[in-house]
């Protein structure tokens, strides 16, 4: 069976684009978009490839995505080589099938069909594509957004193709995401011999009451759109490896996934007040990965709901759960941002796969969103 969405997805999967290596994926997408009359602007930074493409003028709907994928893990555990796309029992297998080369294929084919039907469409259709989402996300979408904002580029709506669905395509759309901030905390003590604790100051012992309080704290209660803020300790390191040395320092790394009830500044202030209360000698560094964002009901959310209902006869849940995505950068432009993509059950796993029929459905949903917003 000839299906342009599946064929393009297979083309992309064949390219081992381990983040941030694009491995030629964007050249394929650019060629398809240029054939439709899109203007292409590449914005390559270091080892990261990015492009911004647009067609038409006026109110702007952008489709955003990434060509990079995560490592495969042990390839011997895959039923088929991860970069040799295979269809078996109606499922398309391969690294990136769900996250997110399937979405990219669905977007581009949707654009081809849309332009064929509306060659003189009224609004502007755009694409923002990067090869740096899965790894550091430092030279990708965030840098493109900064460049677009610097020149006051218009962006009204953005559909991110992240795999948002859980059971069937379109059952969940993400209309926001929690913020993420990480603390790298070092508690300072005095190294010494375990037999002479009075001559040392054990930073692990010092840290434990403070860490207990951190874990027990209710940071907020969440709200209508977001679950309560969560704090998780990710790494703890101390000691020399010897059983007779009291360590001099204790390193603790912890991360907050926070709702719109808090800001990153409020979190930092609360943590530092807690550490001061416990009279610790410490140093702390913070890394903000993204602020929370929320897209309320409006034209984009309504268009997404309409498209899903039309093609899959279900009403999508609007959720803000999960990790961060590049939507956090795009939201800075004041755009309405929604994520809609395939089922995420196998993303980052061995034998990543997606229903071939889901990608065909997804492409039709994307096309209908285009028709509602920029036709």
UniProtKB/Swiss-Prot annotation:
Its cofactor is Zn(2+); Co(2+). Transmembrane segments: none annotated. It comes from the Bacteria. Zn(2+) 1 binds at residues 66, 99, 162. Its EC number is 3.5.1.18. Binds 2 Zn(2+) or Co(2+) ions per subunit. GO terms for biological process: diaminopimelate biosynthetic process; L-arginine biosynthetic process; lysine biosynthetic process via diaminopimelate. Belongs to the peptidase M20A family. DapE subfamily. This is Succinyl-diaminopimelate desuccinylase. It comes from Erwinia tasmaniensis (strain DSM 17950 / CFBP 7177 / CIP 109463 / NCPPB 4357 / Et1/99). The lineage of its organism: Bacteria, Pseudomonadati, Pseudomonadota, Gammaproteobacteria, Enterobacterales. The gene is dapE.
């Amino acid at each position: 069976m000839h299906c342009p969405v599946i064929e393009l997805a297979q083309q992309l999967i064949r390219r081992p684009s381990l983040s941030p290596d694009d491995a030629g994926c964007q050249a394929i997408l650019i060629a398809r978009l240029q054939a439709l009359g899109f203007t292409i602007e590449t914005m390559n930074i270091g080892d990261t490839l990015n492009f911004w493409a647009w067609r038409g003028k006026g109110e702007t709907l952008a489709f955003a995505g990434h060509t990079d994928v995560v490592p495969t893990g042990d390839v011997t555990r895959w039923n088929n080589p991860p970069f040799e796309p295979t269809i078996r029992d109606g499922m398309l297998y391969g690294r990136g099938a769900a996250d997110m080369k399937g979405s990219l294929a669905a977007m581009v084919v949707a654009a081809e069909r849309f332009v064929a039907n509306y060659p003189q469409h009224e609004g502007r259709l755009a694409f923002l594509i990067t090869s740096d989402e899965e790894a550091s996300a430092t030279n990708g979408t965030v840098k493109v957004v900064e460049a677009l904002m610097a020149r006051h580029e218009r962006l009204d709506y953005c559909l991110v193709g992240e795999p948002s669905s859980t059971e069937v395509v379109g059952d969940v759309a993400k209309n926001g995401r929690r913020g993420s901030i990480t603390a790298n905390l070092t508690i300072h003590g005095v190294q010494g011999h375990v037999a002479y604790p009075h001559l040392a100051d054990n930073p692990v012992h010092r840290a434990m009451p403070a860490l207990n309080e951190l874990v027990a704290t209710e940071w907020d209660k969440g709200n209508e759109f977001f679950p309560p803020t969560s704090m998780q300790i990710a790494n703890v390191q101390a000691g020399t490896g010897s059983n007779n040395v009291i360590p001099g320092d204790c390193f603790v790394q912890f991360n907050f996934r926070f709702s719109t009830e808090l800001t990153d500044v409020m979190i930092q202030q609360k943590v530092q007040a807690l550490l001061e209360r416990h009279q610790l000698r410490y140093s702390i560094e913070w890394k903000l990965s993204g602020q929370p964002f929320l897209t309320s009901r409006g034209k984009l959310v309504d268009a997404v709901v309409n498209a899903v209902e039309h093609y899959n006869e279900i009403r999508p849940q609007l959720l803000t759960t999960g990790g961060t995505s590049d939507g956090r950068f795009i939201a800075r432009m004041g755009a309405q941002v929604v994520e809609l993509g395939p089922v995420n059950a196998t993303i980052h796993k061995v034998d990543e796969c997606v229903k071939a029929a889901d990608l065909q459905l997804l492409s039709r949903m994307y096309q209908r969103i285009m028709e509602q917003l920029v036709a």
